[in-house]
Amino acid sequence: MSGVRGQEKSPGEFRSSQNWIGGAGSTLKNARYIPPSPEDMVICMSDLEKYMNAEDDETDPLIKAGLMHYQFETIHPFLDGNGRVGRLLIILFLLQHKVLSTPALYISYFLKINRIEYYDRMSEVRRKGDYEQWVKFFLQAIYE
């Protein structure tokens, strides 16, 4: 995979080391967020997979997609590409549940121009368990 962004970060494989989220030059000590350890991450991904594939007629697929996206980004299972994979999972889930008929959903631009709010909203869920504000933000991203 010569010339591919992130090629030194084991593309396609779950991470085997601790990662963190923060600005350029951040370390584990001053990270904005530290995802689960590699050991816990595997358990979290298994739980997420079960949730994604559970037959759940009571949760609207758009809301479930938002919850799945939050959880995937919180788990952060790869050293690189989590955002891209997370956005792809949204599209695949909505196609599977017939919310989309074609893979024509582009929320990357919305999330890019609202990056600070995107991170802040996910942090609110982690700090306070406030999923409602996250789901509203996610639905706004889908709508726009």
What does each of the following model-derived ranges do?
Residues 1-144:
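FIC/Doc superfamily catalytic core
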